[in-house]
Amino acid sequence: LELGGRVFYVPNIKKDYFGYIKAFRKLLSQEKYDVVHVNMLSAANIVPLRLAKQAGVRKVIAHSHNASAPGIVRKLMDGMNRPRIKHYVNEKFACSEKAGRWLFGDKAFERGEVTLVANAIETDKYGFSESNRRKIREKLGISGDALVVGHVGRFQVQKNHEAILRIFHEIQRKEPAARLCLIGDGELKEQIQEQAKKAGVLDKIIFTGVCQDVERYLSAMDVFLFPSLFEGLPFTLVEAQANGLPCVISDQITGEAVLSRENVTMISLAESPEKWAKAVFKMKEAGRIEREEAARRLAEAGFDIHKEGQKLM
């Protein structure tokens, strides 16, 4: 917005399908866009692509950010819509090879039709800060030496918060002073809070809600826990590594999101919560990667916003 961008609101397509179409068509006809760039977590909704094509938009881009989708209905919609995408777009983008193959197909990827654009970030912004660590811990009422396990993600099936609770329960058994910091919001939040209450760990968990300054909270954490059921290329995992945080993640996450095996442990979702907890303790002992080294690895892996942004020009 500071650079002159504008935000337009249209009805929620799930709640008002025809209202969404009417509003989107009106927007396209009034503004006369040269490019429409659609970020996609699945192919369940390809309506924006179709409407942009019908409106005569010169360049229509579909950008894949996921590698699977939950639910039978969404899977059926994905299967039906994926072959149709090619009729509406000029460009196919993906945040990772896995995400590109999933949405656009192996053949399109191997023919070189898919451009990989990493989920890049501002490296300086996400670097570790001792000042932020101290201030956020004070704000949350956490002692300086307590183990803080953190997670950033929407409360939905994909992020696997139930597994996070099971793992943290094991961590609590061995280190009662440990705290869990969950950043985000979503439809499953109340359900997870109720499960935490039943497990007897609710008072050890901090639910921050949506934060506009996630980078400050990352500095307050000791280990980043990310047992997702599936992912394209998770932005929050890249941010955690930019902060130098040791990470314990599921084996369903693409290796393209791992900057270095030195401070990332990948574990099968089939493994027990005990094994996950042991990995958390081990990574905590390994400690953070230095700020300068984390920034260097980020740039080498292609996650520097200044370099990746050029691909969109």
Regions found by a protein language model. Give the residues of each.
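A short, active-site helix/loop in glycosyltransferases that binds the activated sugar's phosphate group
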Residues: 88-129
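A charged, aromatic-enriched C-terminal amphipathic alpha-helix characteristic of glycosyltransferases
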Residues: 125, 140, 287-313
